[in-house]
């Protein structure tokens, strides 16, 4: 297969690459055959290989970088609250590609970048409230690709998620590999990710010995957390835990504190991002009166992962490995 050896050599032990650009086809993209992909359950045809992709948010941007597609990007938008980007495997991508906005994408900055594809997701850039949607961009002649983790699932007007979160990552890597002519690179990444996760799964506890985990993103009046279709669901399960919100048929959503208390998690995982630091979130949780009887709080079992670890991104396998190592130290009550 084309580029298999190159792709394999570029992969690191974490199945991510630093400084290994994809061997993107150099033929006239305008004359290349159209590519039809299934995206959010719909057949979408792209007439040509995009040259000026604009992305929204860190996980989506790093999917492009992991595929070595920096040269196909016109820029990205994301807040500057995503931690230190100088030590990540895709440092060169961040240095090379223009940071268009520290806010969400808008039609104006997409048009200014002369984008020929927008790669974003529902609540990861796309939003109904001000009309920044794939349909609106289509009217401007700009195609879109929607992050699979964020696909609307039809259970309610805003509920998201149509497949297990890691499967969503593999789907997007495979689809984009096909669109950009880097199928071998995508296949090598997916294979590497699956192997690393399988290695963690093999060490995980089973059955009743699996710690129960609550993902805390933010919120004091009502916590913002992860249901069964958000990336933390599968990150937790592959690491050897059980998401206490597994039965919530949504991706990212709010619940009541009474639900957290009732489900009595053994561990709380904090999503580190935004103006409130992980340490501040931890202090709040450990001192929030309704939680004083919760096992995780009584035993001070709080683990921190970065935002990009917990949204669909090529950092998910590393997050599984780190959380798995922590959960193996937890004695089930």
Predicted features and spans:
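Bacterial Sec-exported substrate-binding components of ABC uptake systems
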Residues: 2-12, 16-63, 175-215, 327-333
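Short helix-initiation/N-cap motifs at beta->coil->alpha
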Residues: 39-41, 97-108, 128, 248-257
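Solvent-exposed loop/turn segments at secondary-structure junctions
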Residues: 59-62, 79-82, 117, 123-127, ...
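Extracytoplasmic ligand-binding site segments that recognize negatively charged/polar headgroups
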Residues: 82-84, 124-132, 142-175, 208-231, ...
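Short helices/loops that flank or line small-molecule/ion binding pockets
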Residues: 106-117, 132-135, 255-264
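Structured C-terminal subdomain patch of bacterial secreted/periplasmic proteins
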Residues: 163-172, 247-248, 269-333
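Alpha-helical, coiled-coil/dimerization segments enriched in small aliphatic residues
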Residues: 225-252
């Amino acid at each position: 297969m084309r580029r298999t050896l190159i792709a394999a050599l570029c992969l690191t032990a974490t199945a991510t690459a630093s400084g290994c650009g994809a061997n993107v086809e150099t033929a006239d993209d305008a004359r290349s055959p159209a590519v039809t992909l299934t995206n959010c359950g719909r057949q979408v045809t792209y007439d040509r290989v995009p040259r000026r992709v604009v992305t929204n948010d860190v996980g989506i941007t790093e999917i492009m970088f992991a595929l070595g597609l920096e040269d196909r990007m016109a820029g990205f938008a994301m807040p500057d609250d995503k931690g230190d980007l100088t030590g990540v495997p895709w440092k060169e991508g961040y240095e090379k590609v223009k940071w268009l906005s520290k806010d969400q994408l808008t039609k104006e900055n997409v048009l200014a970048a002369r984008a020929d594809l927008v790669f974003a997701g529902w609540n990861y850039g796309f939003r109904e409230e001000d009309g920044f949607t794939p349909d609106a961009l289509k009217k401007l002649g700009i195609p879109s690709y929607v992050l699979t983790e964020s696909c609307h699932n039809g259970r309610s007007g805003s509920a998201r998620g149509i497949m297990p979160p890691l499967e969503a990552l593999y789907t997007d890597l495979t689809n984009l590999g096909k669109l950009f002519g880097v199928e071998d690179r995508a296949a090598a990444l997916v294979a590497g990710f699956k192997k690393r996760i399988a290695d963690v799964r093999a060490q995980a506890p089973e059955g009743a010995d699996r710690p129960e985990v609550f993902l805390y993103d933010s919120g004091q009046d009502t916590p913002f957390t992860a249901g069964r279709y958000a990336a933390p669901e599968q990150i937790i399960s592959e690491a050897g835990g059980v998401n206490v919100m597994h039965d919530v048929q949504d991706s990212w959503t709010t619940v009541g504190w009474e639900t957290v208390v009732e489900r009595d998690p053994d561990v709380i995982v904090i999503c580190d991002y935004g103006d409130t630091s992980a340490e501040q979130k931890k202090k709040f949780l450990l001192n929030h009166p309704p939680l004083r009887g919760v096992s995780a709080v009584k035993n001070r079992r709080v683990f921190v992962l970065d935002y990009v670890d917990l949204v669909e991104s090529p950092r998910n396998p590393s997050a599984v490995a780190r959380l798995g190592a922590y959960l193996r130290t937890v004695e089930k009550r």
